[in-house]
């Protein structure tokens, strides 16, 4: 049969495995907030969107709404900026306002 040291060893490995999985899940779920906007106001007559979904950004970055367009920023632990909502209307690249003849 098994000795008590084998049973303790198996129990310890199961506990460590569970803690490891919990730790990894916490890292994946934690954070994910946008930091404070660097440029809340934009002086340009157009916007430049570098991202239109969270999947457009690298791991550890978040698609954030800035004054001059959406940009990928490093994740923050506190929600100080505005995170882009996947599924919202968005166009990559330079986005110009309506042409003068489209206002009427």
Curated annotation (Swiss-Prot):
Secreted is among the record's keywords: yes
InterPro entries: Elafin-like_sf (IPR036645)
Domain WAP: 31-76
GO molecular function, one term: toxin activity
PTMs per UniProt: Contains 5 disulfide bonds.
Disulfide bonds: 34-64, 42-68, 51-63, 52-90, 57-72
Biological processes per GO annotation: defense response to bacterium
Keyword flag Signal: yes
Signal peptide: 1-30
Alphabetical UniProt keywords: Antibiotic, Antimicrobial, Disulfide bond, Secreted, Signal, Toxin
Any one annotated GO CC term: extracellular region
Localization (cell): Secreted
Tissue-wise expression: Expressed by the venom gland.
Chief localisation class: secreted
Role noted for this protein: Has antibacterial activity.
Family as reported in the entry's similarity comment: Belongs to the venom protein 11 family. 02 (wap-2) subfamily.
Listed name of the protein: U20-lycotoxin-Ls1c
Organism per entry: Lycosa singoriensis (Wolf spider)
């Amino acid at each position: 049969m098994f000795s008590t040291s084998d049973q303790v060893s198996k129990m310890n490995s199961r506990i460590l495995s569970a803690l490891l999985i919990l730790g990894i899940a916490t890292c994946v779920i934690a954070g994910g907030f946008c930091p404070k906007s660097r440029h809340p106001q934009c002086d340009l007559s157009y916007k430049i969107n570098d991202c239109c979904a969270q999947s457009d950004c690298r791991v550890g970055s978040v698609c954030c709404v800035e004054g001059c367009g959406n940009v990928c920023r490093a994740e923050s632990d506190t929600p100080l900026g505005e995170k882009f909502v996947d599924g919202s209307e968005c166009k990559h690249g330079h986005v110009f306002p309506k042409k003068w003849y489209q206002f009427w």
